[in-house]
């Protein structure tokens, strides 16, 4: 949904669907998948990533990343685009590192990857991947796991998730790595701000 989220009376509101659609930035952040695909095709893009959150039953403790690419798990179908799996794999360790560190605990896939072809996972290609550019959709966490949803409301946490994808992209292209670090964590004491 629209980001950055705005607090109302010190809390983040739970919008009804109608209220959500009436937000000023709704159209900006909720474009048709066909529009996104047209933009990808028209702009000579060489790396596509679509960042999302996943859903299960509200209040669940299910929480893990899922990378989905066009094609099949065996990377042998005519639908597969060369480089899809490799791009996912380059980012997996960095994204999964956030979860295995305990900052955003993972309920599954701690010791193995979760990189899947849409053809096997869903039986069809997701609308946002119906273009001819190599890349993937990533479900970084489950927003129905309440701690993950609240972390996603924090711009610093979103920056950290973005850094994970950035580092994977740098690895994929073999580019020079950054030479600075980031100190990230959580404060669990009301007296320390």
Residue spans for each PLM region:
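Active-site-proximal helix/loop segments of hydrolytic enzymes
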Residues: 1-180
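Structural motif
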Residues: 186-193
């Amino acid at each position: 949904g629209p980001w950055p989220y705005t607090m109302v009376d010190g809390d983040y509101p739970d919008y009804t669907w109608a209220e959500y659609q009436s937000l000023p930035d709704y159209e900006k952040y909720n474009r048709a998948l066909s529009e996104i695909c047209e933009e990808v095709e028209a702009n000579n893009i060489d790396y596509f990533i679509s960042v999302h959150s996943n859903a299960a039953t509200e209040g669940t403790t299910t929480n893990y990343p899922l990378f989905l690419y066009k094609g099949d798990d065996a990377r042998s179908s005519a639908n597969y685009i060369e480089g899809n799996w490799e791009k996912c794999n380059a980012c997996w360790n960095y994204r999964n590192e956030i979860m295995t560190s305990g900052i955003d605990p993972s309920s599954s896939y701690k010791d193995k990857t979760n990189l899947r072809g849409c053809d096997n996972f869903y039986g069809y290609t997701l609308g946002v991947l119906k273009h001819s550019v190599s890349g993937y959709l990533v479900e970084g966490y489950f927003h129905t796991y309440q701690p993950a949803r609240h972390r996603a409301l924090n711009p610093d946490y979103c920056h950290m998730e973005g850094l994970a994808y950035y580092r994977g992209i740098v690895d994929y292209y073999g580019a020079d790595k950054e030479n600075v670090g980031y100190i990230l964590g959580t404060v669990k004491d009301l007296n320390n701000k």
